Amino acid sequence: PPPAHNPLYLSSAASDVYKRQAYNAALPILTEYGTELSQNARLQQAYARVDGGLPADASEARRNAVAHALRDFHLAGVDLPEHEKQRFREIMQSLAAIQADFDHRIQDASDAWALPVDDADELEGLSTQVLQRAAAEASRRGREGWLLTLDYPTYHAVMTHAENRGLRETFYHGWVTRASDQGANAEWDNSDNIDRILALRHEAANLVGFRNYAEYSLATKMAESPEQVIEFLRDLASHSRLAAEAELAELRDFSGMVVEPWDVSFLLEKLKQEKFSISNEALRQYFPATMVVSGLFELASRLYDVEFASDPDVVTWHEDALYYRVRNRGGEEIGGFYTDLFARSGKRTGAWVDDCVNRKNLNGSATLPVGFLVCNFSPPDERGQSLLTHDDVVTVFHEFGH
């Protein structure tokens, strides 16, 4: 199959020094290509001719496709004098590099954070799965006891289940101060990057006729103005505040203490268990990752009349990543799909779906499309089994839906 080894994808899913170098080398080339394509006056004129020649009965989708393309040419500065076009291109190059560095600093700050623990009592409430992973990480780094890292499964487990309030507070501060001037590692402070991104976005927006970046951003969205967005958010907050305050009061009454941010997830889990006798950890046994993926593909097969077949011979970027050939009921291969489900060092947090090979080549010929699903679930235990929470299952199905 067409490999998903492009540097932009691997920078998020399997970053190391070599892949990051490849990413940094490819980024300015791709940025230059994208900007020059968007500023190509001949291409814009071709779209304008298509727009002028649309028949009266052209579909709304067709009209919108052309209108959006023409809009995007304008947003890229196609109408500007040459010296301003050049400045816009320079800004796009700078933004691409700074935003990449912003992401890398968050990743590096997250990977560098670790908390050694020698007393098992400090880890009360954490599952066997989390403890085994922490013990293995300590052993890997030549330490005794446990080493808790800031990968999302560990962070979520501590914030939701750790009885040790001080441990939860430590993790909370570690998470929210990553790559900041208040974080544990000043070398990855992103404050300057934020200032530079804001300034460059503002300048780019001004160049193409907007007062600020907020207006520029909304040119491709449903909201008509920044003021409309702020009004919507304030209205939403006014309707949500009473309910939120009532729920917070319930947590205070339930716990008998002043509720801090690092207490909320923990107390919500305790309250849910008391009121409804439901435990997210207890539900894990029903959701082995392999069974969830199998069920996902079975549902897709019923809905779309396709089949997914794992191909272990395909070389991937990590042993956790698997490749599936997608075939129709007649056995014809119609695409491919990668899954990369488990958290690890060098991998961006979160969950996302994207394509790495499009359906058509630039010359218009068809090729097999390939997509990928990336998540950050708890890695398999010593038995090779990863048990998901119900929220994890929802995440898998949500992302696959894209």
Indicate residue ranges for each PLM-predicted region.
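Single conserved hydrophobic/aromatic residue that forms the stacking wall/gate
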Residues: 1-14, 18
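Aromatic/His-enriched, Gly/Pro-containing loop or helix-boundary segments
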Residues: 58, 69-74, 185-186, 355-367, ...
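Active-site-proximal, well-structured secondary-structure segments within enzyme catalytic domains
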Residues: 65, 94-97, 104, 108-149, ...
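Short small-residue beta-strand/loop micro-motif enriched in glycine and branched aliphatics
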Residues: 157-158, 225-226, 381-385
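Short histidine-centered catalytic/ligand-binding loop motif
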Residues: 160, 170, 281-288, 386
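Active-site recognition of the HExxH zinc-binding catalytic motif
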Residues: 391-402
